[in-house]
C-alpha cells in the first residue's frame, strides 16, 4: 500500500535489503508453492520498487567511479547497510558511519539481485518484453559492479560481507574468483573463524563457504 500521500514523500525512503522484500518474499513464496497468484497480486508493487531502484541508480554519486558505470549502480541516499556486523566497528567517527561504509557494497549488490529476480518473475508471468528490459538493466548493473568497483580495487579490504554477497549473487568475475576466495578465507582466519558479516550477508555465508 502506498502511504506516501499520508506521511509525505520526504519521510519515505526505500533502503536496500529491507525494501527489496517486496520482490524477494513473493518470489520465494512462488518458488516454494509453485503458485503464481502471489506474483500476480504483488506485481504492481514489485514493479514500482524496481523502477525506483533503476531511477535512483541513475543519480550521480560522489564516488570515484566512471559515469558509464556509476549510472547503473544504486549507490545514493541513506541505507542501513550491515550495521549489525560484528567483524569490526565504525572507522569514520560519524553517526551511522558503519551504515555508510557497508552500504557502499550492499546497496548496488542488492539492487542488482532484485532486478535480476524481477527478470525471472516476468519470465514466469509471461511478460516477455518486461523480462527483456529488466534483464538488460540487470546485465548492465552486473557489468558496472565488476568494472566500476571490483576491477578498480574499490572493494572494502576488511569487511567480510562484501565478499560473501559478491559470491552469493554471482558477481565475481572468473579472473578474480581465486583472489576473492583467498580474501574471504583470510578474513575468516583473521577473525578466529568467527562470522563477521552483518544481517544482510549472514543468511548467505554458509552456502558461500560450502
Regions found by a protein language model. Name each.
Residues 1-210:
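Active-site core of glycosidic bond-cleaving carbohydrate-active enzymes
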Amino acid at each position: 500500500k502506498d502511504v506516501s500521500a499520508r506521511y509525505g514523500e520526504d519521510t519515505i525512503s526505500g533502503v536496500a535489503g529491507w525494501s527489496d522484500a517486496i520482490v524477494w518474499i513473493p518470489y520465494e513464496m512462488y518458488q516454494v508453492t509453485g503458485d503464481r497468484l502471489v506474483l500476480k497480486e504483488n506485481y504492481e508493487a514489485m514493479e514500482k520498487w524496481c523502477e525506483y531502484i533503476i531511477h535512483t541508480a541513475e543519480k550521480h554519486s560522489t564516488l570515484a567511479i566512471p559515469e558509464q558505470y556509476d549510472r547503473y549502480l544504486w549507490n545514493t541516499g541513506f541505507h542501513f547497510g550491515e550495521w549489525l556486523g560484528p567483524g569490526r566497528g565504525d572507522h569514520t567517527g560519524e553517526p551511522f558511519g558503519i551504515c555508510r561504509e557497508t552500504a557502499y557494497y550492499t546497496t548496488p549488490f542488492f539492487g542488482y539481485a532484485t532486478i535480476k529476480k524481477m527478470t525471472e518473475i516476468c519470465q514466469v508471468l509471461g511478460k516477455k518484453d518486461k523480462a527483456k528490459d529488466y534483464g538488460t538493466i540487470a546485465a548492465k548493473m552486473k557489468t558496472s559492479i565488476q568494472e566500476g568497483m571490483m576491477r578498480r580495487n574499490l572493494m572494502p579490504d576488511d569487511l567480510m560481507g562484501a565478499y560473501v554477497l559478491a559470491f552469493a549473487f554471482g558477481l565475481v568475475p572468473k579472473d578474480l574468483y581465486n583472489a576473492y576466495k583467498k580474501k574471504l578465507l583470510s578474513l575468516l582466519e583473521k577473525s578466529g573463524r568467527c562470522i563477521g558479516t552483518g544481517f544482510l550477508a549472514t543468511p548467505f555465508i554458509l552456502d558461500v563457504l560450502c
